[in-house]
Regions:
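Charged interaction scaffolds used for protein-protein
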Residues: 1-17, 28, 32-50, 61-109
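Short linear motifs in exposed loops
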Residues: 21-22
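Intrinsically disordered, low-complexity regions enriched in acidic/Ser/Thr/Pro/Gln residues
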Residues: 56-58
């Protein structure tokens, strides 16, 4: 069964769109790189160009040479602009169902 999760983020760098998807695979790759989502959040808040590039590569499922060019593109685009978008993506990884998940009111007995 396929579900569209809350929090898919498109980031445009140097005319190329990177679609970051809130998947368990992305979470695992980011956690492996930063020791957890908190470490990734700290890298974004510290305006780490390489940290932002790693998150983009993990979220977009990039590997090898595709992933290697992302840091330069983040730097060219401006890390502040990129970090704002990545904060939204990381928030979605903490809660992939989104803010409206669940029932508005309790079920009646």
């Amino acid at each position: 069964m396929s579900k569209t999760l809350f929090g898919t983020v498109d980031i445009v760098l140097d005319g190329e769109t990177y679609t970051l998807k809130p998947t368990l695979g992305a979470v695992r790759a980011i956690e492996a790189s930063f020791g957890g989502l908190r470490g990734a959040s700290q890298a974004v808040n510290a305006l780490s160009i390489v940290g932002c590039a790693v998150i983009i590569a993990c979220g977009a499922g990039l590997t090898g040479k595709e992933a290697d060019v992302v840091a330069d593109k983040v730097w060219q685009a401006g890390v502040v602009e990129v970090s704002i978008q990545l904060n939204a993506y990381l928030t979605a990884l903490y809660n992939p169902k989104g803010p409206d998940a669940g029932k508005d009111q309790p079920a009646k007995a």
